[in-house]
């Protein structure tokens, strides 16, 4: 575990419409029921400043490098003000999206983007990576149907199936590259409770 922290850092990753936020909330409530010190947060966002940056990110069309730097600026504020202090106090921190989402959403738009994002994170941040990441694996066709059935309110929701596939296969690649950290939960045909039970087995 990173010597900057005493707690545990858990992240949830995947594309749109796959149930990440639901699973983050369910794990948070489960750990609370066990009297475990835990906080739930999200990216992009998590602090007052970062949430303001999120509004620009999800509703405005930015140039690729501008979008990446916007995400990194929001993350730095989030980590410094919320994540690191909580970890240092011994809390479990659950975060709905983190560095891997930046790789897949912003990095793919840039040449050598995967390595660029990870290297930028290591340079600007205090080398903090999740202890465990849950990739909620839902097939793109299923995910886009779920998104289309709800109120779409940001630029990522309304993109087509090709975008969903690109993001999906990026997360698949990352899970193959970092199998010790990233745990794949195949969730296309499972209920939220069944997914939650699988996640608990990895804790």
UniProtKB/Swiss-Prot annotation:
InterPro entries: P-loop_NTPase, Thymidylate_kin-like_dom, Thymidylate_kin_CS, Thymidylate_kinase. It catalyses: dTMP + ATP = dTDP + ADP. This is Thymidylate kinase. One of its GO terms (biological process) is dTDP biosynthetic process. Keywords: ATP-binding, Kinase, Nucleotide biosynthesis, Nucleotide-binding, Transferase. SUPFAM superfamilies: P-loop containing nucleoside triphosphate hydrolases. HAMAP family: Thymidylate_kinase (MF_00165). The lineage of its organism: Bacteria, Pseudomonadati, Pseudomonadota, Alphaproteobacteria, Rickettsiales. It comes from Rickettsia africae (strain ESF-5). GO terms for cellular component: cytosol. Its EC number is 2.7.4.9. It holds the Pfam family Thymidylate_kin. GO terms for molecular function: ATP binding; dTMP kinase activity.
């Amino acid at each position: 575990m990173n010597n900057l922290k005493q707690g545990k850092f858990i992240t949830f990753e995947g594309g749109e419409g796959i149930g990440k936020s639901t699973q983050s909330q369910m794990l948070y409530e489960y750990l609370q029921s066990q009297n475990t010190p835990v906080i739930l947060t999200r990216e992009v966002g998590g602090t007052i400043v970062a949430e303001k940056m999120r509004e620009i990110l999800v509703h405005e069309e930015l140039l690729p490098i501008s979008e990446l730097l916007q995400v990194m600026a929001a993350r730095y504020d989030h980590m410094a003000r919320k994540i690191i202090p909580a970890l240092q106090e011994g809390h479990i921190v659950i975060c709905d999206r983190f560095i891997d989402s930046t790789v897949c959403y912003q990095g793919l738009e840039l040449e050598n983007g995967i390595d660029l994002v990870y290297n930028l994170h290591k340079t600007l941040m205090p080398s903090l990576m999740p202890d465990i990441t849950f990739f909620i694996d839902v097939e793109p066709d299923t995910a886009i149907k779920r998104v289309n059935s709800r109120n779409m309110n940001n630029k990522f929701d309304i993109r087509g199936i090709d975008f969903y596939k690109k993001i999906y296969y990026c997360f698949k690649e990352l899970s193959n590259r970092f199998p010790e950290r990233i745990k794949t939960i195949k969730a296309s045909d499972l209920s939220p409770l069944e997914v939650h039970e699988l996640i608990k087995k990895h804790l």
